[in-house]
Amino acid sequence: MPLFPPCLPFARRLLPLSLAAALLAVPVMAPAAEETVRSFRIAAAPLGQALRQFAGQAGILLSAEGGLTQGKRSGGVHASLSIPQGLQQLLAGTGLVAVQLPDGSYIVRLAPVPLRADLDGEGAGLQVLAPVTVLGDNDDGYRRASSAAASRNDTALRDTPQAVSVVSAALIRDQDMRSLADAMRYMPGVGTAAGEGNRDTAVMRGNSSTSDFYLDGMRDDVQYYRDFYNIERVEAIKGPNAMVFGRGGGGGVINRATKQPQWTNDGEASVSLGAWRNRRAALDVQQVFGTEVAMRVNAMAENSDSFRQGVNVRRSAINPVLAWRLSPRTSVVASYEHFRDDRVTDRGLPSYRGRPFETDPSTFFGIAGSSPSWAYIDALGVTLEHDLGGGASVRNRMRLADYDKLYQNAFPGPVSADGENVTVLAYNSATQRRNLFNQTDVEWTVDSGSVRHRLTAGLELGRQTTDNLRNTGYFTTLGDNVTHISLPISHPVTDLPVTFRPSATDADNHGVADTAAIYLQDQLRFSSRWQAVAGVRYERFAVDFVNNRTDARIARTDTPWSPRVALIYQPVPALSLYASVSQSFLPRAGEQLASLTPSNAVFEPERFRNAELGAKWEVTPLLSASAAVYRLERSNVAVTDPIDTTRAMLVDGQRSEGLELDVNGKVQAGWSIAGGYAWQRAVLTATQAATAVEGATVAHVPRHSLSLWNRYDFSPAWGAGLGLIARSAVYASVSNTVVLPGFTRVDGAVYFKPHGHFQLQLNVENLFNKKYYASAHSNDNIAPGSPRALRMTALWRF
């Protein structure tokens, strides 16, 4: 079987051409200097915060390397000034200056007068560091150059020795992304599984997870479909890193960063209409109250059908966020979110003879009316930050979240050998969970001789209380104990009633998981060229698990150490080369805290170890590229002892290795790109079951995957987008008996902005109406890709 479908050779040729064009292009036009006088109201604050507020009030793209602003404060600006004058006053006394770039954006740099000798003794003077975008309403392409989650502090990606892919707010907006599946297609090395039609499932470097999701760096691990209505960016932080995130994250984690108050009085409202009665409205409003309080409210409502027969989604949400400056050194941000998602659980299509069953993609298999799913979430978050002075600061974050989740489904099983009938089964599963987490971080930047240390020490405490209940579906009109039926493949739906009740083996349990962890990280800068990162986390993770059906109680406590070590070499300021080693662990309770049994409770957690080499290049202040090669080993996998089948044993169970290439940003004025390529190989290194044998390829992992999106603005009023997503074949399960063929999908968009406050946007998914299979959960739960779908969005800014 070819690795790429017939149309993919074109994609293979297109990627290097696009990358070459991006890396060689330079801005060619410089706008006139900004001389318009504006009224600025910015109170004294930490410099990074003041710069963000200035950029929002000025409506400019403003960039600054995170290390330059660390520990510095601004006296603020309260005057009517031009943008250059305002920046000059804002930066007074900091030793920094703002410089306008040819594309009209601004970058904060060291002042031309040397402030201190070069750390490596090679001289003193101006060193231009790669910028980190802190805020800007102007389109900066799709580049984001920093992450607050990957290192537990705001660190430039260039100084982060780990592969990180970021989907920015601009890319989310331009593609009208609404789900993590949409975003993950533009993250090299990150894929999706179907998630049984009721949840996000990420596949990162060969490891599938339903729990490795974070919101503003805090755990958000219940199974549901997340929305982007209040999201500023999405980050894939690849490779295990328990030093930062704690348990899990064997292949990495997905972090969503929410929209925060930007100390401006503005807002936007949007309405979308599209194929299959797609209807959605969203609102984003900001308001400043004096100089000390600001609020931002995001809200959303959606009522949409699907190309799949009988499938729909109804969702709504609201997220108010309040920021309060208690003093020039202290701030508090409080947020609340209410989120509701009601939909029909769609398990997709079955397979036949090693391929997805050939039928119309709209065909539903099972009973749509007996397949409701809902997720109701209420979450409260509070962040307190205080500048201690002397390069030190403290931050405390708390998140309390209640989750109420149920999914019920009557879904397809195997197709009969003659291809005439399909089996249908049913069950439901309910989860109620309360998460309470508190993180306290103390950060201190200090020089020790010729070495600069950026120290982060912290404490994390958490409790998760979970109740799980599962019931089997019985087709009682055919018999009290009938749990499956056979339907003709020509009409694989029925309205037979289903009765749900517990079987002898269905889950009914209660669990409490307690986390207590301390960690220490040192980001060392030895010179302008050499850096290192070293950190370690000690965690006590205890689970108390009760089987309500048997009254059996099981407990397990793990106390692992999780180190992280990396070295960074920067031969020139814009280029970083790094080597890193990190690891993580997964307790026997499993990612959803419901897998602890008497037989596995005696075993140590699974281990994930990642070794990585990479390069990150800031091609221009608005365009970046990266590359990474890695090997990830999964060990302590529990399998049946082949000699004594009554016992279990631990083996080194899986190896993943690969190459990831990533490019994001603005090539030149008007042209933005986002894309990447990944080569992956993930295999089992030991037999784990009769259908999971040594040498098998891990499910949902393509050998090749490619994504590339371009937006070009022809004028201030008109723009267009064009992109492709391509993937080689994948297996639906680790049995390697069912193959989802590779595919290439082309998407497009047109943007019309008649004036500064109003925009129309048309997005076309699957422009050429390609038939393909997007993902799978198992051999007989395969999700077909959508046919051509159009969505029109009207947006009004005020």
Regions found by a protein language model. Name each.
Residues 229-232, 243-320, 326-330, 378:
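Outer-membrane beta-barrel translocator/receptor signature
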Residues 323-327, 433, 452-456, 460-464, ...:
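Structural signature of Gram-negative outer-membrane beta-barrels, strongest in the C-terminal barrel
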Residues 384-399, 403-411, 577-578, 605-686, ...:
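Membrane-embedded beta-barrel scaffold of Gram-negative outer-membrane proteins
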Residues 302-306, 318-387, 400-433, 479-507, ...:
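Acidic/polar loop-and-plug regions of large Gram-negative outer-membrane beta-barrel proteins
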Residues 61, 128-264, 613:
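Acidic, small-polar-rich N-terminal luminal/periplasmic segments of exported/outer-membrane proteins
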Residues 631-633, 650-735, 768, 793, ...:
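Gram-negative outer-membrane beta-barrel transporters
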Residues 726-733, 751-798:
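C-terminal beta-signal and adjacent terminal beta-strands/loops
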Residues 380-403, 426-546, 666:
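Face-selective signature of the C-terminal outer-membrane beta-barrel domain
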